[in-house]
Amino acid sequence: MRVTRRAFLARATLACAAAGAGCSAAGHPRPGPPEIVVERPDDLVDSPWSIWLRGFPPASRVEVTATVAGWGRAPWRSWAAFETDSSGEAALAKATAFAGSYRGVSPMGLFWSMERQEDEKAGPAMALTGAFPVTLTAGSRGGARAEITLDRRLASAGVTRRDVQADGVVGTLFTPASPGPHPAVIVLAGSGGGAWLSPAALLASRGYAALALGYFRMPGLPHGLVNIPIEYFEAAITWLRETVRPREDFIAVIGVSRGGELALLLAASIPEINAVVAYVPSGVLFGPFGPSEPGDNRPRAAWTHRGRPLPHLGENNRTVDWSAVDQKRTPIVERSVYLTMLRDRDAVERSSIPIERTRGPVLLISGKDDDQWPSFDLAQIAYRRLQGHRHPYPFAHLSYEGAGHGITFPYTPTTSTSYVHPVNGRTYSLGGHPAMTAGANADSWPKVLAFLEDARRQRR
């Protein structure tokens, strides 16, 4: 395979047994020793890699293993078997994996199909602004072998991280390496609380001043998703405008799950927000989750505005059937109970977010096999409101067959289809097939970046 001169190629150091490094079965010498060739061997996580195998025995089985450490408490690993062509080469973007962690053709299959190796210890955790080394090893049964270590990054070189605790605002600000001013994005986590750091780092790498904003389960913030005031987010926007001074005064908000619900609520409530991206969101408000603050005897809601609790779907819901969920099952599949709630049309109307008030474009992203909650149905509520009110700005709903609750940026493992919730310790199903969720990630993320860029252009 021919690669342009401008392509920066990483050629692996190798260990090649004599039996596998001589001539091909047909007696023709191979062009060189076994090697793994990769363009841009140091790149952002959301960038696909082109990977080639070269110099292996022709028409032979070659197994490739990918391992990454530094992502949590254990390493992640995948493998796949390919067949080389008559020249002893294989382009992994086009080659069929006929065995391994995934099957078929998937250019980045070795990355999304990684599984956590619970019986192994990981190395030291990598800094969010550092590199995550990925080791690729390729070997044939004849003994030919090659290895290369590559770097994946959430933050490009020069991106800075600043932990924020100012004026009551808590979070982490990522700033691009390039001179400002930069457009700004607020990034919101879901029902686990804390700050959603990874996409904020990636967005800073793409030119945005990105504030991963906490709103509960961080020092100085509530312990639960209970009675969170909209005024807190207004204060965060004021702080961001004064600190970052966003280019063209552009501020977008991105949220996932309950954070997606929140992103839609904020966009409908705060006129300074110019665009919203909501991952696996809800177009209706849901109720509180987790503990109230000591001494807070107010009625419990997730969100308040000017001291008033905002109505939520579960409040006085006449059709909810809690028996629709088997609480003894592990992992728990919750979507069924939410579908029973949606049958109460009055409750849906009371709790619907007036998303049509948003002063900018809206992008909704959902998975049709979401077990956490029916994100497609919930996002459609917002989409239909935008349609019904003839929203004057662009809006779209990207929905993906077979994808679960874990839609995010691409080329990271999607094999964990359940998780232990950090608030209540229970195990929930995310739903989705790993390959389908990976496909949703790969398709949606470039559209998110294009959406933000288009929204910025409208401000100029």
Predicted regions mapped to residue ranges:
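N-terminal secretory signal peptides and thylakoid transit peptides that target proteins
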Residues: 1-16
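N-terminal cap/lid segment of alpha/beta-hydrolase-fold proteins
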Residues: 40-42, 49, 135-180
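Short beta-strand element of the alpha/beta-hydrolase
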Residues: 181-190
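Primarily recognizes the serine-hydrolase "nucleophile elbow" in alpha/beta-hydrolase
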Residues: 194, 198, 238-310, 342, ...
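Short amphipathic alpha-helix adjacent to the substrate-entry channel of hydrolases
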Residues: 196-213
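Catalytic nucleophile-loop/oxyanion-hole region of alpha/beta-hydrolase
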Residues: 217-248
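Serine-hydrolase catalytic core
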Residues: 323-403
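C-terminal catalytic histidine-bearing segment of alpha/beta-hydrolase fold enzymes
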Residues: 377-380, 392-460
